[in-house]
Amino acid sequence: MMQTWDPRTYEKNGAFVPGMANEILQWLDAAAGERILDLGCGDGQLTARIAATGASVVGVDASPTMVAAARARGIEVLEASAESLPCGDACFDAVFSNAVLHWVRDQDAMMDEVRRVLKPGGRFVAEMGGHGNVAAISVAFSAVRARHADPGSEDVLNYYPTPQSYALRLSQHGFHVDRIALIPRPTPLAASGMDGWLRTFRSGVLNSLPEELRETIIAETCALLAPALRDENGNWTGDYVRLRFIATIPNG
């Protein structure tokens, strides 16, 4: 049931991910000469934007296909998981991450690694799914799968914490939380709508099913969600909630 990523599908159905990253990039406030790690860089769209500031940027991603897409942009990218970074100690001024951390299974190992690679005074700037993120989608998807005797384990696909719980977790790993916020962000989906969203962001679950059952589950999930998330013109809006934070490593 491992989630997989196809760069072309992601660009088609998930363009809103880099497209709605302006605010977290402002929080990062990258400067020329800084060395920055883009954790979960995907196809490298945001990595390239950070590099355009004059910062020296290295991307890391666990998906071989996404790593290849990012490298095609001329970006330096390492293929690795967030829980085991192939980087030296205290070598980055900042670690940046957008729409990735809620996919990380071992949050504690990830935080230890981020702290290890940051210089004293370095900052961890990230946006991820927060408490309540895609709640309607998740409930509908689970309900439809249960109807077809495939309850699965939707609850372990993603981790959507509250600001309070995540701030505590960061502090337990030696970070000082400078700023953290939970932000409701209704998100217009691509022209492919909920069908495309499910095929992209729940591919790990769907691809484990027989094709006929997969298509049935997609169709029934879309039908169940349409009254709440599709407007009269057929446009879909995802019920996104983002958790955004800046956490720093104390000097000395």
Residue spans for each PLM region:
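A short SAM/SAH-binding and catalytic strip from SAM-dependent methyltransferases
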Residues: 94-107
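Short alpha-helix
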Residues: 159-173
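Class I SAM-dependent methyltransferase SAM/SAH-binding core
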Residues: 35-84, 109
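A short acidic, Gly/Pro-enriched loop at the edge of an enzyme's catalytic core
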Residues: 83-94
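A short glycine-rich, Lys/Arg-flanked "PGG" loop and its adjoining helix->strand segment in the class I
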Residues: 108-123
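C-terminal helical/coil "lid" or tail adjacent to the Rossmann-like core of SAM-dependent
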Residues: 178-233
